[in-house]
Amino acid sequence: MGKTKNLTVEITGMSCASCAKRIEDTIGNTNGVSESIVNFATRKATVTGRAPAEEIYKIIEGLGYGIVKEETPAVSEREIAKSEWKKFLVSAILSVPVFAISMFMIHFRFSDLTQLVLTTTVIFWPGIGFFKNALKQVMHWSIGMDSLIALGAGTAYGFSVITLIKGGSGLYFESASIIITLILLGRFFETKAKGKAGEAIRKLMDLQPKMARVIRDGTEKEVPVTDVQVGERLAIRPGEKIPVDGAIIEGWTSIDESMLTGESMPIHKEEGDKVFGGTVNTTGLIYMTAENIGANTVLAHIAKLVEDAQGSKALVQRLADKVSGVFVQIVILIALLTLGGWILAGYQFNEAIIPAVAVLVIACPCALGLATPTAVMVGTGRAAEAGILIKDAASLELAHKINTLVLDKTGTITEGKPRVTDLFNINDEKETAETDNKNGLDILHIIGSCEQHSEHPIGMAIVHYVREQGIDLEEVKDFKAIAGMGIRAIYNESTVLIGSDKLMTENNIDVSELKQKAMEIKDESKTIAFLAVDNKAESVIGIGDVVRETSKDAIQEINDMGVEVVMLTGDNEVVAETVGKEMGIVSVKSNLRPADKCDEIKEIQQSGKIVGMIGDGINDAPALATADVSFAIGTATEIAMEAANITLVKGDILRACEALKLSRQTMNIIKQNLFWAFGYNVLALPVAALGFLNPMIAAGAMAFSSVSVVTNSLRLRRLRL
């Protein structure tokens, strides 16, 4: 026994939810296993604990199922569907003549023998898999969907063979062959639909290019992306995808990051900016250095998060799992009671066998097993496309119950980083990119050029603001950062100071004419910086945290959904009330420490509310952990926030609104699926037992019941967020 770890293994041979439930329970009862989840829809088991992988493999194989180890190439849903289609075609070609002979009473010399030969071929060629799996299940004291199919088709076939040998009438070869044919057709559609449900992960991984242009020994070489090493220099031309995560070291461009954030507008990138594998370089030639490769890239991490979420179980699935665990046994009991009841009612065995077979083949535990996981698969995949990463199915499920949403201010409602908000010259005139002050000084050009070498957040905010105005910067001389106060530089032979009032005072610079504006800016809880040129004060700059463009609309939409919005912030009351009023938030609490936020959330929960919390995942970690559902506002570089149930990659409250919509619609789909799955079986079994359904019709109904569940789940792919 080693340390606790997670093991994910792909399982082959599962035919229904009963199989998955049996494997899950057996592994879960193994010493050293703390949790076992087997997902029938994804064909994967996720095991948490200290039990060795080889022991888990032996348990699965001991139950009669196969495993796909890491060194074995995984079989895709597309390949499985292709195999099922071939089996169906063979079965259909052989079954049509049998059906025609029986239904249209076509009699010729060897008509009965023809039915025997064709049906035998169907049973022992395309249909042999059902019987092999059923035999394995019986040998391991387990029965599943394949057991029901084999028992139903086998009973009809066996009875017909015995009747033919005895020279009697009333053959049911067509029932046996058509049952196999329709089930194979249903399996084909089901597999194809399940493949579509799991397309999100494949689409994500397909985003990464196969090749990369690496600069080695001064020469550009095209190599497989798997050969790229950390620290290597890469070239990316316009229209090409970024191969791995890294930083731009030369050039500038616009990057389409929609696959990460869901944001359609390209993002401007220049030297020093981070770029991520799978995103698209839309305009300029850039050179970058590789920083994260393989499984360490953002793209790979997102794919892993989505895969983990799709493999988890929603709480609502527990009832379906319990029913699935005993479903097949109950169906066999009902079939035996049906057979006995018809015989006791005075019918012959050859008449009583038909409703019994219909009961066996119409039952559908698959629909029960697929009702929840397929909706979760499609829902989490659709969320990832929109830049919403959901940790597990339980989070997706609980989010639809949220009726109170708590927001932090800084970094959630606001951008969380300094921006230039005010710029006034000595004459109280607002400076713009197009105007100079009365002395002919280009204020923007001065402050941008002088601050371009600053590593302080305020200096970088000033440079960002100036560059946004489209102004080119020039080099300055004798740049010096003055700790805690600002910077000094020589611009066109003039001495420039940018910084605090303390810096101005120490250099005997009079800022009295700017004091009023400075106080107005300070009253808005913003930081101020003065500009002095040749010992004369010229401007005051206001730097603050600005509200995100989408925050107000998002909060309004959340309110319209019937969810109360509460703002909890550590900022002072004046700032908090101002932002709250601007955003239309009625309930605002200010001057709160992290522990205070937790207490506020607990108080809301005690009133019976389900609380969601949106924060930046760092200072708000305690509050995020206290909430029923936590949303982490982040960027592509912060998606590993373990504290959050849901990560909003774009860093936008609007994504939280979309997550709530998706959660509600996913739960609606799950409820519809479960209603259909339970309702179908509750109604179908007695109808079949009473003799109202031919086994062939029963087989068709069963085959398409699971298909309907998966197809309903696929509607989430078209959900507009």
Per-segment meaning from a language model:
Residues 54-75, 79, 108, 112-115, ...:
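Actuator/coupling domain of P-type ATPases
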Residues 104-107, 139, 158, 162, ...:
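Membrane-embedded alpha-helical bundles of multi-pass transporters
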Residues 135-140, 192-203, 207, 374-393, ...:
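Juxtamembrane helix-loop transition segments at the membrane interface in multi-pass membrane proteins
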